[in-house]
C-alpha cells in the first residue's frame, strides 16, 4: 500500500507535466513550424481531418508552405486557417497555401513569455494539488490505523521529493520555451 501512494503520485504528476509540455508546444514562438497547424482540422469527405494529414507542410525562411494532396482542398485549408484563433493569414496562390510569419516585436515576445509562465504556473498548481490530495489520503489512512506513523513520515518526505522534482521539471520547460521565444 505504501508504494501505491508513491506510484499513484508519480503517475499523476507526470501526466500533469506532460499536459503542460503539450500546451507549451502549441504556444506560438514567432517561428514557422508545422506544429502550429496540428490542431487545425478540415472536413475531408465528411470526416474532420488534421491539415497535416492531407497536405505536405514545409518551412521556407519565415513561412510555412502547405501543399495539399488534392488541389480542391486549397480553399478548405485556407478557410480553416482563417477560422482558427491562431491569428495567421494564409495566402492561396492556386497550387499551395503560404503562411508568412513576420518577425515578432519585443512586445509580442514578452506577451508569449507571459503566457508560457501562466501555463507553467497552472502546472505547478496542479502538481501541488496532487501532493495535497495524496497527503490527505495518507493522513486518513494513518488515522484509520492502516499505515504506521513511520510510514506516514517517509511517504510525506517522498511525496515532497516528487513534488520538488516535477516543479523543477516545469521550471526547465519554461526556461526552454522562454529561450525559444526570445531567441532571434
Swiss-Prot record:
The name this protein goes by in its record: Ribosome-recycling factor
Bilayer-crossing regions: none
Entry's family note: Belongs to the RRF family.
Keyword check for Protein biosynthesis: yes
Annotated Gene Ontology cellular component terms: cytoplasm
Main location: cytoplasm
Any one Pfam family match given in the protein's UniProt record, by short name: RRF
Gene Ontology BP, a term: translational termination
The entry's keywords: Cytoplasm, Protein biosynthesis
Amino acid at each position: 500500500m505504501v508504494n501505491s501512494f508513491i506510484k499513484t503520485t508519480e503517475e499523476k504528476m507526470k501526466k500533469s507535466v506532460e499536459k503542460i509540455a503539450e500546451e507549451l508546444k502549441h504556444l506560438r514562438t514567432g517561428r514557422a513550424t508545422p506544429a502550429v497547424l496540428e490542431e487545425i482540422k478540415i472536413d475531408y469527405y465528411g470526416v474532420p481531418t488534421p491539415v497535416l494529414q492531407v497536405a505536405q507542410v514545409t518551412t521556407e525562411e519565415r513561412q510555412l508552405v502547405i501543399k495539399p494532396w488534392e488541389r480542391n482542398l486549397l480553399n478548405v485549408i485556407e478557410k480553416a486557417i482563417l477560422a482558427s484563433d491562431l491569428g495567421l493569414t494564409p495566402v492561396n496562390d492556386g497550387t499551395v497555401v503560404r503562411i508568412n510569419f513576420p518577425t515578432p516585436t519585443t512586445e509580442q515576445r514578452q506577451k508569449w513569455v507571459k503566457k508560457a509562465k501562466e501555463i507553467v504556473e497552472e502546472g505547478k498548481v496542479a502538481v501541488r494539488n496532487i501532493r495535497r490530495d495524496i497527503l490527505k489520503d495518507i493522513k486518513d489512512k494513518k488515522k484509520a490505523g492502516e499505515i504506521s506513523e513511520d510510514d506516514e513520515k517517509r511517504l510525506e518526505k517522498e511525496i515532497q521529493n516528487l513534488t520538488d522534482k516535477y516543479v523543477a521539471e516545469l521550471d526547465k520547460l519554461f526556461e526552454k520555451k522562454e529561450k525559444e521565444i526570445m531567441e532571434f
